[in-house]
Regions:
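Secreted/periplasmic carbohydrate-active enzymes, especially glycoside hydrolases
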Residues: 1-124, 135, 140, 171, ...
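Substrate-binding/catalytic cleft of secreted carbohydrate-active enzymes
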Residues: 110-112, 120-292
Length: 292
């Protein structure tokens, strides 16, 4: 088919590590030469950062039920320090330009986030413009990389959801291959409000397969799925809009926990923010959250 693949490696000694606080980046340049004549054919470059995310990988039985016990989980860390997400959800849209958001506006968004001590972004609920990920790498923003999958209307109708299995897998594969080399992506997400079943066979294994596509292809990032308790292989618990009391119970349970949406910031909202964060800071297994 005219394609060729190759593999190589290079050891980088004592690199300056990347994090939201210190977004150190390096530039990798790959150049192609004709193997017979040595003629230069062209180059591509990619910015990348060095960082290590450590987490406990959830194991499941053949039915998708989690067999990793709560006590076996360790806090999720980046470069040996607790990963704490002070984040927001963001739709890739603009009141003036609609779905075409200028690069300048995207950069203004990221700069405002940094100025207000936000360090994380959930790309609700789809992959965003490539430039946004470049900015997150550059400025230091942790990103939950979401598959373009939102199934509100069919949330508990597996017999109908299965009709979209090929589409969902295609979007998952596309998101992964497009974003896998982005330093800012610190976790993967299978989308938004998709399903609430712990069974691996639900929707003919659709969501189980999406989760395990990520797990089988990337052992360096944890997997998120809203409302999952680790079943089907997700590596953290997640809920939308829980009570403060629920947060304390999750903190006591030891498994990593993230608020993928909370404190709906519309109208007279964003209540109990201090109480939420008192609960989040009460235990190292708490990952923080993303305001809606």
């Amino acid at each position: 088919d005219g394609s060729v693949s190759t593999a190589g490696s290079k050891l980088v000694l004592s690199p300056e590590l990347w994090s939201a606080e210190t977004p150190n980046l390096y530039t990798m340049v790959l150049s192609l030469y004709d193997s017979k004549t040595g003629t230069y054919m062209g180059s591509v470059s990619q910015q990348l950062g060095f960082r290590e995310i450590e987490f406990t990988k959830s194991e499941v039985d053949t039915n998708g039920n989690r067999i990793t016990t709560d006590s076996e989980y360790k806090p999720i860390t980046i470069n040996g320090k607790q990963l704490l997400l002070k984040g927001t959800n963001r739709h890739d849209t603009d009141p003036e330009y609609g779905k075409y958001v200028p690069h300048e506006t995207q950069e203004e968004d990221i700069k405002l986030m940094k100025q207000y001590n936000l360090n994380a972004l959930r790309t609700s609920h789809y992959s965003n413009d490539e430039y946004l990920y470049y900015l997150c790498d550059k400025y230091g923003i942790y990103v939950m990389g979401e598959t373009n999958l939102e199934s509100h209307a069919l949330m508990n109708q597996g017999e109908k959801q299965v009709n979209f299995k090929n589409l969902a897998m295609d979007r998952t594969v596309t998101a992964f291959n497009r974003l896998k080399n982005r330093t800012a992506i610190v976790m993967w997400s299978t989308g938004n409000e998709n399903y609430y079943s712990s069974s691996a066979s639900y929707a003919n294994g659709m969501f189980y397969d999406l989760i395990w596509y990520f797990k089988n292809n990337d052992s360096t990032r944890p997997i998120h799925s809203e409302s999952s308790d680790g079943n089907n292989g997700t590596d953290m618990r997640s809920n939308m809009y829980p009570s403060v009391d629920t947060l304390y119970s999750r903190a006591a349970a030891n498994m990593p926990y993230v608020l993928c949406e909370y404190d709906h910031a519309m109208g007279n909202a964003v209540g109990n923010l201090k109480e939420y964060w008192d609960a989040i800071r009460s235990s190292d297994n708490m990952l923080g959250g993303f305001i809606w």
